[in-house]
Design a protein with these regions (language model features):
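Transmembrane-helix signature of polytopic, membrane-embedded enzymes
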Residues: 85-105
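Alpha-helical transmembrane segments and terminal signal-anchor/GPI-anchor hydrophobic tails
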Residues: 148-277
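Hydrophobic, aromatic-rich transmembrane alpha-helices
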Residues: 82, 253, 257-263, 271-299
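Transmembrane-helix motifs of polytopic, lipid-linked glycan transferases
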Residues: 56-58, 70-92, 283-287
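Interfacial juxtamembrane loops and adjacent helix segments
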Residues: 3-52, 56-60
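Short acidic/glycine- and proline-prone juxtamembrane loop motifs at membrane-interface regions
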Residues: 115-122
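Membrane-interface helix-loop-helix junctions at transmembrane boundaries of multi-pass membrane enzymes
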Residues: 87, 91, 141-144, 271-272, ...
Length: 368
């Protein structure tokens, strides 16, 4: 793609913007020579490899092919997203350490967003959208923000469709809940409405039957794990292309996404980081339950938004993904939101006295 800029610039820009390049000429001259333009399998969904290829083609203009320049630029995008997410979280709490912990100190989020991977762009879009959408909701309405928000949503749609599907209903429910006290009812209604919309759309456009698409994706993933004898594969029953099959699989799907890998599934040292991270997150959730505090109405609405996004995303991942390594990677967009939602309730002053009066904890609470 990059070489076309110097040999046939018009072809470069057509491929960069995806306009007028869906023909045999471009397939023969360019696409067939690219390693990842076409995926080894086609599940009928958007090909998220191509946006990363296009971004790196643009970066190469200034990087001259140096890998580390690409890594630095993508890390900068990830930092912009993380910083924007931190600004959003700080609006809802006066505790800086809770924000730092949720955004910057989760190992899997830092690891997967630090390379030349889709997660860096994903975090960039999520963070910027969250911050700018909040400003649109609670500050003066400015139409100039709308095109930018739609652009960020388009990035999510192209980059990770399952994140887009989880994020949009949660965002819309957060927006609607601003005008009512029935926050949970609004979010539940949005989820049910989304499912009904998907079922209706499947009747009109059979190729967009989301239940069949997810069942096929899970089937392909299971077969792939068996064909390559993946070390971190887990047992999973095949989904049937009907709603009842998905409902029955929901509890196990959420358990897989929230808790695995388990200590009994450790097969190498690489299993320990996600295990310890899961234990840490579960520990925070438990502490927030027993040593929690009341939150304001505005905070409560944001917490439910965070939980709705996390649960929908975890459910999609748990239903379709039979490989632990993939589960760990796929769920990182929701981890900062889940962690912050738990920390919003946590009140360190309610801990046992010998812990609450620890000098380090006192310093953290008073200075951060």
């Amino acid at each position: 793609l990059y070489e076309a800029l110097w040999t046939k610039p018009m072809d470069f820009f057509k491929m960069l913007f995806g306009i007028g390049c869906q023909n045999e000429y471009f397939e023969t001259m360019y696409f067939d020579k690219m390693n990842n333009w076409f995926r080894s399998y086609d599940n009928g969904l958007l090909n998220d490899n191509r946006l990363v290829i296009r971004i790196n083609a643009v970066f190469r203009i200034v990087s001259f092919g140096n890998y580390h320049v690409h890594s630095l630029l993508l890390n900068f995008l990830a930092f912009i997203g993380s910083y924007s997410l931190a600004r959003l979280f700080l609006v809802f709490t006066d505790s800086k350490w809770k924000t730092y912990l949720a955004v910057f100190l989760i190992p899997s989020v830092v690891f997967w967003s630090s390379g030349i991977l889709k997660e860096a762009v994903l975090l960039f879009a999520l963070g910027l959208f969250g911050w700018n959408f909040y400003r649109l909701m609670f500050e003066k309405w400015q139409w100039k923000r709308v095109p930018f928000l739609l652009f960020l949503l388009a990035i999510l749609l192209v980059m990770k469709l399952y994140v887009f599907i989880a994020f949009v209903p949660a965002v819309l429910a957060w927006w609607i809940s601003k005008y009512t006290k029935r926050t949970i009812l609004v979010h539940a209604s949005m989820i049910i409405g989304g499912i009904l919309f998907g079922l209706a759309l499947a009747q009109i456009v059979p190729s967009l039957n989301f239940i069949e698409i997810m069942a096929n994706k899970q089937c392909d993933f299971i077969n792939l794990s068996k064909a390559f004898n993946v070390n971190s594969a887990i047992e999973m029953s095949y989904l049937e292309p009907n709603l009842w099959s998905f409902i029955k699989a929901t509890p196990q799907a959420l358990i897989n996404s929230f808790t695995r890998p388990w200590p009994t599934e450790i097969k190498s040292i690489l299993f320990f980081p996600p295990l310890l991270e899961n234990l840490f997150i579960i520990g925070i959730l438990i502490l927030s339950w027993f040593y929690g505090k009341k939150v304001s109405a505005m905070q409560w609405k944001f917490v439910i938004f965070c939980l709705t996004f996390s649960i929908i995303l975890f459910l999609i991942i748990g239903l379709t993904t039979p490989i632990l390594g993939a589960i760990v990677r796929y769920k990182i967009p929701a981890i900062p939101f889940l962690m912050f939602a738990a920390l919003m309730f946590f009140d360190g002053q309610k801990l046992p006295r010998f812990i609450a009066q620890n000098r380090l904890l006192v310093w953290i609470n008073s200075h951060l």
